[in-house]
Every structure is written in C-alpha cells, then in structure tokens.
C-alpha cells in the first residue's frame, strides 16, 4: 500500500437527510403529473429544517425550487404581527407534522403534497374589459399558480380556524392539511377551490 493510498480517507456514506430528523422524502409520490416540477420534495431538495435562507424571489420561477415545506413555513408568517417570525412558524409546522403522523400514521410530507394537489384550483376567472364593459372570462390556471394558491388557501384556513379558538394553530394546520388531503369539504381550502371553479364554470 503506497503512502498516497493510505492518506486518502474512505468516502463515508451520505446520511439520509430527514426533515426535522424524522420524515424522509424518499417515498413521497406526486400523483399529479403537471405539478411534479413545481412541488420541490425530492432528495435533491431535502433539508433538515425548512429554513434555507435562499434567494428564491431574485428570479422568475425560481421559487418553484424552494422546498415545499419551507414555502408552507414562509406562508404561515402572515399578518403584520407574525412578519419575520420564521422560527415560530418552523415550530408550528414541526408540531403540526407530528400531529398529522399521530392521527393518520402516514408520512406528513405525503399528506402535505396530497393537500396541495387537491386544493389548487384548475380553473379561475379573470376580468376582461371591452369598450367600457367589464366581463369575467374563465381561464386555465398555470401549475405554479395552482401550488401558490393551494399553499395560501391552506395557511389562511388554518389561521382563521385558530383565531379565537381554544385549539392551537398547529392543531388547526394539521386538521386543514388532513381534510384537504382527503378532499373533504370540511377544509377551507377545498371549499374555496370548489367555489372558484364553480364561478369559472359559469363564466365559460
């Protein structure tokens, strides 16, 4: 054995990166083919914490590469009093994921992905102005906007459910995600999505 061979250390196996040290991304399936490029959940985007401090707003479409749990965490930091309190929202998401696992026995990442797929509206209506008259026209929704809107609706539903309620926001977020993943109309996001699609259908 030469001196050089002795000096080279054996390459250690890269450890399996698990979110919060618990949840693996390996077995997460994205069943909607149109959203596969916009829900960043594969090993490439695996993180221990949903806090990468990346500059995802610097370029168009770059936010699609932001890990999906981090996007949920960022969206929970809404309404003036919560702005910038990312550690608080990381704690909320961690607690919510533990509740989801206790209630369903599934990987919370899979529940989150299913909830996002189910609560993103496929059709919406936009305002078209013609010669002084404004009418609404049904339009298809792009995949990135579907993901954006789904995350926003899920967080809004959890926030409104927790307001003036004995339940904590983590419990409300867990309930919202579980109901949305099932496609249940108890979910705020599913109700809003159905309403948007119904309005769009009437404006075709």
Curated annotation (Swiss-Prot):
Modified residues (Phosphoserine): 142
Family: Belongs to the universal ribosomal protein uS7 family.
Keyword terms, alphabetized: Acetylation, Cytoplasm, Isopeptide bond, Nucleus, Phosphoprotein, Ribonucleoprotein, Ribosomal protein, Ubl conjugation
N6-acetyllysine PTM sites in chain numbering: 47
Protein name (database record): Small ribosomal subunit protein uS7
PTM-bearing positions, type N-acetylmethionine: 1
Cross-link Glycyl lysine isopeptide (Lys-Gly) (interchain with G-Cter in SUMO2), sequence positions: 47
Pfam family, one: Ribosomal_S7
Protein task: Component of the small ribosomal subunit. The ribosome is a large ribonucleoprotein complex responsible for the synthesis of proteins in the cell. Part of the small subunit (SSU) processome, first precursor of the small eukaryotic ribosomal subunit. During the assembly of the SSU processome in the nucleolus, many ribosome biogenesis factors, an RNA chaperone and ribosomal proteins associate with the nascent pre-rRNA and work in concert to generate RNA folding, modifications, rearrangements and cleavage as well as targeted degradation of pre-ribosomal RNA by the RNA exosome.
GO biological-process terms attached to the record: cytoplasmic translation; regulation of translational fidelity; ribosomal small subunit biogenesis; translation at postsynapse; translation at presynapse
Modified residues (Phosphothreonine): 14
InterPro entries: Ribosomal_uS7 (IPR000235), Ribosomal_uS7_CS (IPR020606), Ribosomal_uS7_dom (IPR023798), Ribosomal_uS7_dom_sf (IPR036823), Ribosomal_uS7_euk/arc (IPR005716)
Residues bearing the modification N-acetylthreonine: 2
One term of GO molecular function: structural constituent of ribosome
A Gene Ontology cellular-component term: cytosolic small ribosomal subunit
Location relative to the cell: Cytoplasm; Nucleus, Nucleolus
Subunit structure: Component of the small ribosomal subunit. Part of the small subunit (SSU) processome, composed of more than 70 proteins and the RNA chaperone small nucleolar RNA (snoRNA) U3.
Coiled-coil region(s): none
């Amino acid at each position: 054995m030469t001196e050089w061979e002795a000096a080279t250390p054996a390459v250690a196996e890269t450890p399996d990166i698990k979110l919060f040290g618990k949840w693996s991304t390996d077995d997460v399936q994205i069943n909607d083919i149109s959203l596969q490029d916009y829900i960043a959940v594969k090993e490439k985007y695996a993180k221990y914490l949903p806090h990468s401090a990346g500059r995802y707003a610097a370029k168009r479409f770059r936010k699609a590469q932001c890990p999906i749990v981090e996007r949920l965490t960022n969206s929970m930091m809404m309404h003036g009093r919560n702005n910038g309190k990312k550690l608080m929202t990381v704690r909320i998401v961690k607690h919510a994921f533990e509740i989801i696992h206790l209630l369903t026995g599934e990987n919370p990442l899979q529940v989150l992905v299913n909830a996002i797929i189910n609560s993103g509206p496929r059709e919406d209506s936009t305002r078209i102005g013609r010669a002084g008259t404004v009418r609404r026209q049904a339009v298809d929704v792009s995949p990135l906007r579907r993901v954006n809107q789904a995350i926003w609706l899920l967080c809004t539903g959890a926030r409104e459910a927790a307001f003036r309620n004995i339940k904590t926001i983590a419990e409300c977020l867990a309930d919202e995600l579980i109901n949305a993943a099932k496609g249940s109309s108890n979910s705020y996001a599913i109700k809003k999505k159905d309403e948007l699609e119904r309005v769009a259908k009437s404006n075709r």
